[in-house]
Amino acid sequence: KPWLKNRISRCFFGPIKRPPFNRDELLDGVDYYPGDYLGKLAREGINGLWITVEFRDLAETSFAKRDPMAQRRLEKLRKTVEKCGRYGIKVWLFAIEPASLPAGDPLLAAHPEWKGARGWKNDYAFCTSSESALRYLRESLADIFAQVPNLGGLINISHGERITNCLSALPAVSDAQVNCPRCSKRPKWEIHADAARA
């Protein structure tokens, strides 16, 4: 028995869902988890694998309908969870959420309170300083976990690699003011705590 409760790894064969390729493993027909590989992981004490997802690619909420490709993604995710489970391996969702929203996104038009600090490109941080924003995040996760039973859990980087909430528009050790009309009035820790609690 491993001394760690969860020994989680990224699949050696799985594609990376970021530039330059941005490949979504849940949309292609490739089996990234062959039985021999899963058996070897299980013998080595690995009991978790993570798959990169974006909430809006999978979830339906009271704010947004399900993406047209979501059912295909969810079906492959369910099959992967079931297959890995036969080897005692849980599938964990890896996310960088809440995801920033590009300028012109219909969600920003419908919910201007979600438009947070200006991002690095032509995007905006997802402002978590409103109850509707937090409800959107909670509904997204609840829907995904309801659609795919037996997931291991969620690994989320909410400050680091990309713009997420308004605090993430600043470097982690910055003393600068958060550039958002709502979040600039709040303690920085509170901004991050909201996203984590959702």
In which residue ranges do the predicted regions lie?
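Feature activates predominantly on carbohydrate-active enzymes
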Residues: 1-159, 164-183
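Extended, regular secondary-structure scaffolds
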Residues: 186-198
